[in-house]
């Protein structure tokens, strides 16, 4: 990271990532917005890899280097969150896809296809798509039902 010698500060890239996440992967999500966000994050990752400037050295404490290391992880995590949201063709909990809502604007779940815990496995290469691992949910003590906020 210290050898890139670009022109962008860690903070400027971090701020841009936050804007992308807010605009495209925030509370109200759409497939189109998620795809656009993923493209922007991919471009931002390339910008990070080629145009980052981290002042200082690797000797001793270097706060900017520490922030850069974490920011690289944040970019990858943002991509994983967006990929997960794009793969879930439903609205459930904190995940609200605008395409999947009732006429009243309530979340529209699809338990038939998305009743599982998902974990995305990084493949060790940023250009290789992560693999979704699934573990089906099995409830014995409670009955699964749709939340109703009207009553």
Predicted regions and their residues:
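Glycine- and aromatic-enriched mobile tails/lids
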Residues: 1-151
């Amino acid at each position: 990271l210290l050898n890139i010698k670009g022109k962008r500060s860690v903070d400027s890239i971090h701020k841009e990532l936050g804007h992308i996440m807010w605009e495209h992967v925030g509370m109200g999500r759409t497939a189109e917005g998620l795809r656009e966000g993923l493209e922007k994050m991919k471009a931002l990752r390339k910008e990070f890899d080629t145009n980052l400037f981290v002042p200082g050295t690797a000797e001793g404490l270097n706060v900017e280097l520490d922030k850069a290391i974490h920011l690289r992880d944040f970019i990858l995590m943002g991509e994983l969150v967006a990929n997960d949201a794009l793969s879930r063709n439903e609205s459930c909990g904190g995940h609200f896809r605008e395409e999947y809502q009732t006429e009243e604007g309530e979340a529209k779940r699809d338990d038939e296809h998305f009743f599982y815990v998902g974990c995305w496995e990084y493949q060790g290469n940023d250009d290789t798509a992560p693999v979704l691992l699934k573990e089906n949910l099995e409830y014995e003590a409670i009955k699964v039902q749709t939340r109703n906020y009207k009553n």
